[in-house]
Amino acid sequence: MEEITVEDLPVDSKVKDIIKSRGIKKLNPPQTEAVKKGLIEDKRLLITTPTASGKTLMAELGMISHLLNKGGKAIYVTPLRALTSEKYSTFKDWEKLGFKVGVTSGDYDTDDPWLRNFDIIVTTYEKLDSLWRHSAEWLKDIDYFVLDEFHYMNDGDRGPVVEGVAVRAKRQGTILALSATIGNAKDVAKWLNADIVATNWRPVPLKEGVMYSEGKKGHIILYSDGTTNKLKGDDPIIAYTLDILSKGGQVIVFRSSRKYAETTAMKISQYMNFVKLDDKKLLETAERIKEVEDAGSNEKEVLYNLIVRGVAFHHAGLSKGLRDIIEASFRERIIKVITATPTLAAGVNLPARAVVIGDIYRFNRKIVGFTEMISTMEYRQMSGRAGRPGYDNHGEAIILVRSKVEVDKVIDKYLHSDIEPIESKLGAEGPFFSFVLSLIASEGEITEDRLKDYVEDTMLSKQLVRKYYNNAIDWLSKNEFIKSNDDRLQLTKFGRRVSDLYLNPFTAVTIKNYLERAESPCDIAYFHLIAYTPDGPLVSVGRNEEDALLDNLDCELIIDEPDDELEFSNYISALKVAFILKDWIEEVDEDTILSKYGIGSGDLRAIIDTMEWLTYGAFHVSSILDLNQHTSVLEKLHKRIADGVKEELLELVRVPGIGRARARLLFNQGIKRPEDIVMKPERVKSLLGQNLGEKIVKEAARIIA
């Protein structure tokens, strides 16, 4: 295909200047094909190409061309909050043309009216879904939708929301769907009424292989091109990593669990004295790790000792502050090796010369004790990180297998097979009922014919639509989420609040049913109930922890212990979450919580954020149902979770700049309310320091004014 230079693009010269300022002189093959298929002329496209093939620039060309030629608003939707920040930063370039760029995520109980003044909006699928539920007026102005990481429609948890957003988007404006390579692109494109741009082109060629051990003979890598490589050493991952490092490359090692990622990093670090490193920059990076505030002391110490050796681990248990430093240092080629869980493959763009997939088996989340092979899609996501443009003339993706017997099976599944097809994930009661509720919420009121028309526009088979539709209407009516009025379906007051709060209807019903029968639960019982809902956070519980959690329980729970093994697993997980939260609101030191429960700072933050939202939801559910004996308690618990304090500190933490530690310091010195801060400014300054003290006094005065 004839290439297109940036200068040849049929766009405004200012658009060309911005693209050229990034060092881009010509379009790559996928970008060229997209332009030739109508990207700049507002055509609907499904672009399915490997990682790092320039999909972001395609999105920018599509959005900016639309805004310049037709006006309106463009929205860029991604499944991950980390990606919203990354894309927002990139899109800020277009403010040079006079376009305002905004970003929003989280806080599902608002319609964000301030966004009406923005031209390009970056958000998550969940946030856009919640905005539609709130019937935000400014959403009607959006007529260009970029649906990023569209293959997430195949994800069991996120898929229903991605599909729901696509159903609405394709009725409202132009869609540009960006996806990794998928197995049924033609079917998906037909459903979206879009043309396809599908290619396996990569900016850096990929060399794939499978590695197995032959005992004392060493480790053999069989590459897909027929070549082989033989390595010496006790451990195959270490042997391969050192081989790549000796050639000036970087390595990402994917492991199936956090524990494996951490122990692998520690093993590799012991051999890094053979590798050329920039000790000064590594020490500077390690010192920055020490300064991160949203992380535990132990994990900072462990990472410090690894980073000075050029190695780090990366997983969701780490705080955002730690992950950001590790990612930046790896991009700057200071850290040479990252060992990670597969979540890194789905997140921010972080390429390396070589990628090792250390485990092709993982535990099934639904069936206790059952393992399964990772999908071909997951392998492609991980291998897609191999090869760094501008640094590597090729990338390598190596799969580690347990024995030579597995080699042929692995090559066939991951190197020679098509990726799994995208299928609807609305085919279960929970996601389907929630989808129907969201449609009614976004419409205000809707006829059954129009609602059926929406539902039949999903990728779900007509047979399954018929199976679930009547059940959904019956269940939502029976549980008082919706009501019928002259052949029109509307939300009840309860249904509207649940939808606005972005609660799963099954979560709302669970909370409603148990609160109605509970009299005066303890804090642990409230937390356990809320964590036991479908929206609740899950944490792993060791066998030795189960008895201890139950033995330490000193009050009665609202929910009886289940007999079913899987349900008991969820039940005991919810109990662990409840104990973690109880310690948090009793002002137990964060390091103590992390150590006591064996979690990371990222886990603690995720638990706090999720439970703060759900407790806020439970408060509103109890309020709208006039369950007054619970309402005031839940309101206080929500506020205490937000700040991690005892009830006596709630007044102080209202003041911006005062968190749990400063509030306790002030309280213990007799400063217990904002009024006390204003009355004793010199005492506050002596406790908090002159500059901070002055700011706190001003904020307190503003609050009580």
Curated annotation (Swiss-Prot):
Binding of ATP, residues: 31, 49-56
Residues in domain Helicase C-terminal?
236-430
The segment(s) forming the Helicase ATP-binding domain are: 36-200
Query: Which InterPro entries does the protein's record reference?
Result: DEAD/DEAH_box_helicase_dom (IPR011545), Hel308-like_dom4 (IPR048772), Hel308_helicase (IPR053416), Hel308_SKI2-like (IPR050474), Helicase_ATP-bd (IPR014001), Helicase_C-like (IPR001650), Helicase_Hel308 (IPR022965), HTH_61 (IPR046931)
Give the enzyme class.
Answer: isomerase
Tell me its family.
Answer: Belongs to the helicase family. Hel308 subfamily.
Q: Where is this motif: DEAH box?
A: 148-151
| Effect of loss of the gene | No visible phenotype, non-essential it can be deleted. Greatly increased sensitivity to mitomycin C.
- Spell out where the chain crosses the membrane: none
Q: Keyword set for this entry?
A: ATP-binding, DNA damage, DNA repair, DNA-binding, Helicase, Hydrolase, Isomerase, Nucleotide-binding
Which terms does the record give in the GO molecular function aspect?
3'-5' DNA helicase activity; ATP binding; ATP hydrolysis activity; DNA binding
Instruction: Cite the PROSITE patterns for this sequence.
Output: HELICASE_ATP_BIND_1, HELICASE_CTER
Keyword RNA-binding in the entry? The reply is no
Q: How does it assemble?
A: Monomer.
Picking any one GO biological process from the record gives: DNA repair
Per its database record, what is this protein's job?
A: DNA-dependent ATPase and 3'-5' DNA helicase that may be involved in repair of stalled replication forks.
| Source organism phylogeny | Archaea, Thermoproteota, Thermoprotei, Sulfolobales, Sulfolobaceae
Q: List the disulfide bonds.
A: none
Originating gene: hel308
- The name of this protein is ATP-dependent DNA helicase Hel308
Query: What organism does this protein naturally occur in?
Result: Sulfolobus acidocaldarius (strain ATCC 33909 / DSM 639 / JCM 8929 / NBRC 15157 / NCIMB 11770)
SUPFAM superfamilies with a match to the protein in the record: P-loop containing nucleoside triphosphate hydrolases, Sec63 N-terminal domain-like, Winged helix' DNA-binding domain
Family matches, as SMART domains: DEXDc, HELICc
